[in-house]
Each structure stands twice: as C-alpha cells, then as structure tokens.
Amino acid sequence: MQDLSKILCFGELLLHFAPDSEGNWLNEQSLKIYVGGAEYNVAAALSQWENSVKLLTALPENFVGNQLEFQLKNKGIEVLAGKTQGRIGTFYLSSDGDMQNASVVYDRFPSVFTQSDFEAFSDDEIFSDVKWLHISTITPALSDHAFRKCVHIMKEARARNVTVSLDLNYRALLWQNQNPHKIRELMPFVNVLMGNIWSVEQFLNIPIEYELNGNFNDQNLLKQAGKTALEIRKQFPNVERIANTFRFTNGEKVNYFATLFADEQLLVSEKYNADKIEERVGSGDSFMAALIHGIVKGNPEQKILEDAAKVAFKKLFVKGDTINDSINIEKL
C-alpha cells in the first residue's frame, strides 16, 4: 500500500539579492543573497517542522543549479527539477522593502522556470507518496506553460484525492499584461485557500462591500472577512477553509492578526503589534506552512489559526526569506 505522506509544492526557486537601502553594499562590495520563492519558503518551513516535502521546480544545468539542488536536499526537501540550459530567476529587494510594492525588481524573464514546459516528470512520479499539493498564484502568472501545468496538476491532485491549497499571493508587477481573474479556473480544485480580502477581490472579483478606514481595530474587517468567505463558499463549495492575514504598517510599526473560516464560522487570532520589524519577506509563506502543518496534524481549528498567526508574526523578526531554527511550531 502506498504511503501517502508527502507535501508537494510547485513553484519557482529564486535568488533574492538584498542590498541595503543606503547603497553601502557598493563600497563594501558585499551583497546579501537569500534563496527564496513562495513555494520554496513554504517547503523549507514544513521540512524544518519534520514534514516530508517535495518541490517541483526547474533548475539550470550548471554549477548554480547543482549547488541549489544540494542545498534543498540538505534541508530535507526532495527535489523534482527538470534541468535545462539557462539561468535561475532573481529579484532585488532592499532589506527594508516590501514584496507588495514597487521597491521589488524582478529579473525572472527568461529563466529556466519561465521557459520550462514541465514535461520532465510523469504524473505518477510527481504524485508518488503525495497527500497534499500547494501552489501560490505567483506560479501561474509566470508563463502560459506554468498556468496550464497548475491547472493540470491541481485537477490531477483532486482525481487522486490529494488535498490542494492555494495562496492568493497578489503581485501587481506579475499581472500587468494579463487578467488575474483567470485564477478562477483553478478554484474548483482548491480545498484550502489563503490570502486576504483585497487579494480575493483582485483574483476572484468578490468585492469589498464594507467601508474600511484602514484602522487595525476596524470591526468592518471581520465583517468583510466573513462575508468574503461566505461568497467564496457559495461560488466554490469545495473550499473548506479560508484564511486571511491582516498586516498593517505605519512607518516601522506593525499590527497583525489573522482569521480562519472553517466549519461555517469565522475564527479570529490573537492580535500582535511591534514598534519595529526586521524583515517583510516570507511572513505569509510561513503562515501558509503553519496552516498546512496544523491541518495535516489534525489540530483543532483555533489552534491551527493561532499557531499560524504566531509563526507569521515571529517571521517578521527573522532575516531572509525563510524561517530559521528560532521558530519551532511545537514550542511557540
């Protein structure tokens, strides 16, 4: 009997160049580089928490690709990577920048991932021992091949009774020349959805109906989260859980909380705040990883939410794209 124990993530592996915002890296001739990519960040966290993880991606057929593959395997991640001539995708973001605004500069076209046809592995190879598939909406934005592969493997996952999660990760720069509403084509295969009320509006055309004042304590945020979740459930009844994260920044200060719609009720996490954070990248991915981890373990819904929110908030104080050993989900 097949041991369905692995979590499969499908997405592009990236190098994140992180120059300081003052430009001192030019004189010091020193530039911080992190390995990143939304699905990789999720995979790395899940592996650190002792889940069995596979990453379906593409790597260049050179020493950089070999070193990256070795790094992933060292982290306990099984790698399914079609290797071709080309280069790894990159992005530039200063250490105090935010992935959601114009301070990020992508250099991922062309890359081995955006040029791949993803035909290196059969469905049986991809889904061997897999019980969960995770994708973010970054991946289908990268190429028509990537979009069609997302549709195919999500459909195949459901045919194999594999749970599917989707992170509605909206990056405006990636959707400039295409309609984000095409993500609706993926929704019939999704069981667990993460995002926020604004990304749901962008991707699924479910409008924000309440007047929001941008205040962290605005009760209309919860009303809208509940209303949005009900509309998602109405349109896509296969979606069993809907998570929203709310992060508000004012200068260096941050306020944070999250919600989870499950069993037809809206759960709300503890609220967090800090006067200063260290890192804006990867918090949402760590939330997603914790959400998957909690569901796989069979934890109560409120604990799943609280753990995910706490992990995501803690990630704001960890440099780099992924969590480190300081964030142990079993000892929060």
Language-model features and meaning:
Residues A157-T163, F236-E240:
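A short helix->loop->beta-strand "cap" motif at the edges of active sites that frequently abuts
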Residues L174-D263:
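Conserved phosphate/ATP/ADP-binding segment of small-molecule kinases
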Residues R148-N161, H181-F189:
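Catalytic-core regions built around general acid/base machinery
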Residues L267-L332:
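Conserved post-catalytic alpha-helical subdomain immediately downstream of the catalytic base
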Residues L8-G23, V254-E270:
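Acidic-glycine-rich active-site phosphate/pyrophosphate-binding loop
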Residues M1-I77, G97-M99, F118, K276-R280:
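Glycine-rich phosphate/adenosyl-contacting loop at the front of the ribokinase-like
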Residues S52-P140, L166, E330-L332:
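Conserved N-terminal subdomain of the carbohydrate kinase-like
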Residues F109, I138, N169-L173, W198, ...:
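Active-site beta-loop-alpha junctions enriched in small/polar residues
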